[in-house]
């Protein structure tokens, strides 16, 4: 009798609780961020890593007259994300956002985009506020990274773009690469 009760109890538990071992738990689909980053004609999804090559500018025959920068001539651009669900492809009202840059080697960076003034980064994390609208559908990031001539290295910065109405930002890793030719 106890074996029958145990079997019935086991069957009841299986039916009542369900067997979820093989079934994935459904998660609500997260909407695509309203903002994205475009670089050299390609729009990148949140989570992407973007490589930005450094360019040597020679002002003479000597390395003493050389400047090496990345991000000054060819800069990523903040754009309205074409993948954003529930949004039209054009901006009918202004889209305000926050751009946050984090860089451990912050002294190498000069930030000239999003807001009108150029300023060197003075701390590990810097924040700027911008706006996209029907009349201004993109905004150059203009985050420049300087290198010492012939000191080949890669410097990384993280960019968070978050529209005012969003809970989660779009996140990008920007790798500024000064490679030996």
Where are these regions (language model features)?
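C-terminal edge beta-strand
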Residues: 170-180
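Short solvent-exposed strand-capping/beta-turn motif centered on an Asx-Ser/Thr pair
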Residues: 82-92, 150, 164
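Short, hydrophobic beta-strand segments
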Residues: 137-150
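Sec-dependent signal peptide recognition
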Residues: 2-8
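Surface-exposed binding patches on compact interaction domains or structured appendages
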Residues: 87-137
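Beta-sheet-dominated interaction scaffolds and their linkers
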Residues: 27-88
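A short beta-strand micro-motif common to beta-rich folds, especially ectodomain repeats
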Residues: 153-165
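C-terminal motif of bacterial Sec signal peptides marking the signal peptidase cleavage site
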Residues: 15-16
